[in-house]
């Protein structure tokens, strides 16, 4: 069995090596010739999976995408040909949620404006939005959820309108898929008019899709509104973000919010499980076997961490400032965006760090935030 796989997908060899011949490829430049005799195709979001790519392949048995979203895949085409498809919903949700939370802590420290006491509006309450809410609520932050689709489907959580969210939230975090038409279109959901209408001193975090914000309009608005603080992990025109926009972001990264070691391993592992199910063979591998030990054995706490100490704990796991610096130095180079993604040092999730607590105060919130081993 020939398995064509994006070269940036981790843990392919230990998971799929026994199932067939693995052919690593550049996912962004993948051609029909490279997949014409593949039995299995495993991709990420940089690959457009459609008739143009697959028409020349008569034998494809399975397409898997190690992503939450599927907007890069022509699902109707695959269904029409009877080719099974699976993605990895939720595989990197924890990573994205922690990224957004850490970004807010970093903004709070930079502007000496504590996160505690602020109201955070989350636009899009799917996997990543819910993971972000989980972190915030663990820390005691009031969260407003906006998701008209979830609300219409009967989701029991309390939702507010986008208008209410924009009026009440001090921070807005975006977690919607890109939808280019229809009642709930998200393409340029934040256009010039909406950006200009944001309340004073708002923080705007985007780690879903770059096109959800009109980037050209964002440049125009930022020139007029220095009070609007930005964290941008995604960009219109990836892998070529607008150079003029980058300096306007407090933190800028190359679409790596979901790039935790756990998240990336989880995405590949979910496709492995699905392919084994399709082939009717046992999935003998275990996710825990893939992950290396964390470089900190444990961190001992003498007292309940305040916000400054919490940020320090978060930085033990992931220091956003490092990726921001690398991005600013490299995004304008030829293939710089993709090179940074490919060479990204996979951060760990909070669960990799064990905390030993010796104080008397309540610390369940640290466990709820995701840290492991919290105990007295």
From Swiss-Prot:
Amino acids binding substrate: 45, 67, 259
NAD found in the keyword field: yes
CDD domains recorded: ErythrP_dh
Record's keyword annotation contains Oxidoreductase: yes
Annotated disulfide bonds: none
Pfam family, one: DUF3410
Catalytic activity: 4-phospho-D-erythronate + NAD(+) = (R)-3-hydroxy-2-oxo-4-phosphooxybutanoate + NADH + H(+)
Gene3D superfamilies the record matches: 3.30.1370.170, NAD(P)-binding Rossmann-like Domain (3.40.50.720)
Residues of the active site: 209, 238, 255 (proton donor)
Complex and partners: Homodimer.
Record protein name field: Erythronate-4-phosphate dehydrogenase
Species whose genome carries this gene: Shewanella sp. (strain MR-7)
């Amino acid at each position: 069995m020939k398995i064509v796989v994006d070269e940036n997908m981790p843990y392919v060899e230990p998971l799929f090596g026994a199932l067939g011949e693995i052919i690593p490829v550049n996912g962004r430049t993948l051609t029909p010739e490279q997949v014409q005799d593949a039995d299995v195709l495993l991709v990420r979001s940089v690959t457009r999976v459609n008739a143009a790519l697959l028409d020349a392949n008569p034998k494809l048995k399975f397409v898997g995408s190690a992503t939450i979203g599927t907007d890069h895949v022509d699902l109707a085409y695959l269904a029409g040909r009877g080719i099974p498809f699976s993605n990895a919903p939720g595989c990197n949700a924890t990573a994205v949620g922690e990224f957004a939370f850490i970004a807010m802590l970093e903004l709070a420290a930079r502007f000496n404006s504590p996160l505690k006491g602020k109201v955070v509006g989350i636009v899009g309450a799917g996997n990543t939005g819910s993971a972000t809410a989980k972190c915030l609520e663990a820390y005691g932050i009031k969260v407003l959820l906006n998701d008209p689709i979830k609300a219409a489907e009967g989701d029991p959580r309390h939702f507010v309108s986008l208008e209410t969210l924009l009026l009440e939230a001090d921070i807005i975090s975006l977690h919607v898929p890109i939808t280019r038409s229809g009642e709930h279109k998200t393409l340029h959901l934040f256009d010039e008019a909406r950006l200009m209408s944001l309340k004073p001193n708002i923080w705007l975090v985007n780690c879903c899709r770059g096109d959800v914000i009109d980037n050209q309009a964002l440049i125009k608005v930022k020139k007029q509104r220095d009070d609007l603080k930005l964290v941008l992990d995604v960009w219109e025109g990836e892998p070529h973000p607008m150079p003029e926009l980058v300096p306007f972001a407090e933190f800028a990264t190359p679409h790596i919010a979901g790039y935790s070691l756990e998240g990336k391993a989880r995405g590949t592992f979910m496709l492995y499980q699905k392919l084994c199910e399709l082939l009717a063979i046992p999935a003998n591998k275990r996710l825990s076997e893939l992950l290396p030990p964390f470089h900190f054995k444990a961190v001992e706490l003498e007292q309940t961490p305040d916000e400054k100490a919490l940020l320090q704990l978060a930085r033990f796991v992931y220091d956003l400032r490092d990726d921001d610096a690398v991005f600013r130095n490299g995004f304008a180079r030829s293939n710089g965006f993709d090179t940074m993604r490919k060479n990204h040092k996979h951060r760990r999730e909070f669960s990799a760090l064990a905390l030993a607590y010796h104080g008397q105060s309540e610390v369940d919130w640290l466990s709820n935030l995701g840290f492991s081993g919290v105990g007295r």
